[in-house]
């Protein structure tokens, strides 16, 4: 399966909503899984790979087209977080690194402080 995180706004708060897509592919075919994941993401620009992904020692390297960058050459924090969260669900992935033009890209701000789920009791 491939898990894709999209966002949904409820009561003026943005939440990451996971959707699981069942696919038939070779277990080792990480490029196909990442391509499907990117195609399933709701984003105003097409998301695509420009080079093969690599998975070494638990680190998945994803090489993306430059069209995902904003005018100031940075990536949208929400998009970055969605890609990393989605890719982290792939088998054997412990860390995700995103690259554009062979340069590793980072979010403008730390995405680890985001709240994924809130349950009101």
Language-model segments: residues:
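Bimodal "functional hotspot" detector
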Residues: 1-121
């Amino acid at each position: 399966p491939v898990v894709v995180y999209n966002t949904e706004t409820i009561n003026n708060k943005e939440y990451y909503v996971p959707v699981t897509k069942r696919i038939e592919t070779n277990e080792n075919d990480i490029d196909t899984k990442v391509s499907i994941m990117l195609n399933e993401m709701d984003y105003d620009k097409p998301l695509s790979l420009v080079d093969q992904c690599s998975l070494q020692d638990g680190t998945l390297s994803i090489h993306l087209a430059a069209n995902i960058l904003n005018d100031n050459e940075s990536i949208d924090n929400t998009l970055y977080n969605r890609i990393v969260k989605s890719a982290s669900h792939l088998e054997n992935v412990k860390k995700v690194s995103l690259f554009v033009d062979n340069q590793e890209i980072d979010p403008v701000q730390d995405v680890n402080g985001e709240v994924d789920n809130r349950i009101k009791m």
